[in-house]
Amino acid sequence: MASSLLRNPNLYSSTTITTTSFLPTFSSKPTPISSSFRFQPSHHRSISLRSQTLRLSCSISDPSPLPPHTPRRPRPEYIPNRISDPNYVRVFDTTLRDGEQSPGATLTSKEKLDIARQLAKLGVDIIEAGFPAASKDDFEAVKTIAETVGNTVDENGYVPVICGLSRCNKKDIERAWDAVKYAKRPRIHTFIATSDIHLEYKLKKTKAEVIEIARSMVRFARSLGCEDVEFSPEDAGRSEREYLYEILGEVIKAGATTLNIPDTVGITLPSEFGQLITDLKANTPGIENVVISTHCQNDLGLSTANTLSGAHAGARQMEVTINGIGERAGNASLEEVVMAIKCRGDHVLGGLFTGIDTRHIVMTSKMVEEYTGMQTQPHKAIVGANAFAHESGIHQDGMLKHKGTYEIICPEEIGLERSNDAGIVLGKLSGRHALKDRLTELGYQLDDEQLSTIFWRFKTVAEQKKRVTDADIIALVSDEVFQPEAVWKLLDIQITCGTLGLSTATVKLADADGKEHVACSIGTGPVDSAYKAVDLIVKEPATLLEYSMNAVTEGIDAIATTRVLIRGSNKYSSTNAITGEEVQRTFSGTGAGMDIVVSSVKAYVGALNKMMDFKENSATKIPSQKNRVAA
C-alpha cells in the first residue's frame, strides 16, 4: 500500500497548476491525459545547466564506429593461477553479486544479463555473476550468464571468466558449480571468516576447525571438475597474520588458484592494507603459485586507495563494482581504480595496466544506475555529472587557455564526446530523423518500436518547452529503455486535487495479456490517491520505503525524474551471502516526465513490475543477443 510518505500535504504548495501531458502507449498515437495538482519545484538538480558554470560539452559517445580497442599492452593469456605479464592486473567485477546487496538494488534476471553483456564490452576479466545458492532466481541468472556471456568469444580470443560465490559448504559449492560450469572459463569463489570476532560470535568454531573446513571445501570444489577456485578469508583485515599465513597455505595445497584478501568492514588504512599484502607474499607457503586478489569495502571512504595500495604491493586482481555500489558504504569503484591505473600506472605504480576498454565506462555506469535505481552523486569521480564541470573563474580561464590546466582525464577516454553541441537544441519542428541522429550521437541505438515511443514523448515535451536538451532526451530514453519487463503497463491517469477536498485518482493499467483494468481511489494527495488506485488493480501487497524526485534541468518546465523503493511480502526473499540470513528483497522503480504525478505513478508501477518479475520458481528465458542499448 502507498506509504504515508506521500500523504503529507506540505509536500505540495498551495498553488494549483493544471497541465496536460501525454503518456506513452503502445499505439501509434499519444494519449492525452489532463491532471490538476499542486507542484513545488525541487531545489535539487541532477543535471545543472547554469549559465555561470563552464561545463565541458560532453555527451555519451557510441564507441561502435571506432576501431577495435587495443590495450596499451596485449591482454595476457588467461591461466587461472598465474599471470604471464607481471604488470597486468585482472579486473574482477562483482556488481551483480556484491553490488546487488545494496538496499533497493535488486535486479531482474534480464537486467543482470544486460549488465553482464555490457561488462564484457568493458573488458572485465572476471564477472562474479551472483550467489547461486541464494535463490532459484539467482541460480538461473548465473546459469544464463554462463551459457551466453561466458561463451561469447571476441576476435581477440577474449571471453570473461564467469564466477559464482559460495559459502564453505558442499551444498553451496555444488550449486555454484551447477550454475557456472556452462561457461568456457568457470570459477567457484568460496569463503569463510577468519577473524577472532567472527570465529567466536558467528561461526562458533575454533581456528583448527575453520582450517579443516576451508581445506576440505576447496578440495571438494576441485573434485567437481572446477580448475579455477578462488578462496577468501572473510574479514582478513582484522584477522591474525600468523593464522592467515597458515590457512592460506593450506588452501593453496588443496588447489586454490586465487587468494582474495577482503577488507570486509573497510577498517584498514592504505599503508596497513599494502603491508598486509606484502606480509602475505613473504610468509604464506606456496603463494607464488597463485594470484593474489583484493576486495576493499568503503566504510571509511578508503576502498579505492586500499585497492591501489594492494596492487602496488603485489596483488594482481582487484575486486570492484560499477559506481562503487555494494553493501553498506559500497565497494571499490571500477571506474576510479581503472582510471587511476591508466593515469598513474606508469609513473607511480611500476607500470601496472588493465585490459579495460575505458570508452565503455560511462555507458556501463549509466546502465547500472538506471537498472538499480541508485543515482550517482553529481561529484562522483569519473562518472559524476560534475566530473568535468568548472565553475570557478580561475578554473574557467585556465581551461579556456589549455584543458590540461585542470583536467587530468580526457572525457573521450571514458566514453564522453567533447562537442559544442552537448545541450543541442531540438524543438517541436524537429523530426524523427533529427531525433534518431541525436540519439545515435548520445550512444543509444533503439529499435523502431522504442524510437516511435520516444519520438511521441519527445514531441510532447517539445510542445511545452522551447528547447529540448541532451539531458531531457537522456531522461526520456532512460525512462523507456531501462525499464523492467512489463507485467503491468500504465495507460491513463486522471487526477483531481486541490484545497477543497480529498484528492481523487482514476488509473487505467493493462496487464500482460493486454486486458485493461480501471480503479479509482481517494487519498490525502495526488500521488497517494494514484498509488492506492494502482494497489486496487495489482492486488500485490507492497510497502513504500522511499520516494524522491529531481528535476533534470532548471525551470518550471523541467522534466522530473522520480525514484521509489518498495518492499514486498515475505515470498520475495533470498539468502544473504555474508550472514546466511533470509532477507526480504526491496525493489526500485524510476519514472520521468513533465507531469510529476505521472512520473511518480510510472516509477511505482515499474517497481511493482520488478518485484513481480522476481519469481523464486521460474526459469530464466534467454533473451535475444541484441542489446536494447548498444554502447
Curated annotation (Swiss-Prot):
Positions annotated to bind a divalent metal cation: 98, 295, 331
Top enzyme category: transferase
Family membership noted in the UniProt record: Belongs to the alpha-IPM synthase/homocitrate synthase family. LeuA type 1 subfamily.
Interval spanned by the transit peptide: 1-57
Activity regulation annotation text: Feedback inhibition by Leu.
Protein name, UniProt field: 2-isopropylmalate synthase 1, chloroplastic
Cofactor: Mg(2+); Mn(2+)
Organism whose genome encodes this protein: Arabidopsis thaliana (Mouse-ear cress)
Family annotation (PROSITE patterns): AIPM_HOMOCIT_SYNTH_1, PYR_CT
EC number: 2.3.3.13
Region feature Disordered, mapped onto this chain: 59-81
Domain Pyruvate carboxyltransferase: 89-362
Gene3D superfamilies reported for this sequence: 1.10.238.260, 3.30.160.270, Aldolase class I
Task performed by this protein: Catalyzes the condensation of the acetyl group of acetyl-CoA with 3-methyl-2-oxobutanoate (2-oxoisovalerate) to form 3-carboxy-3-hydroxy-4-methylpentanoate (2-isopropylmalate). Involved in Leu biosynthesis, but does not participate in the chain elongation of glucosinolates.
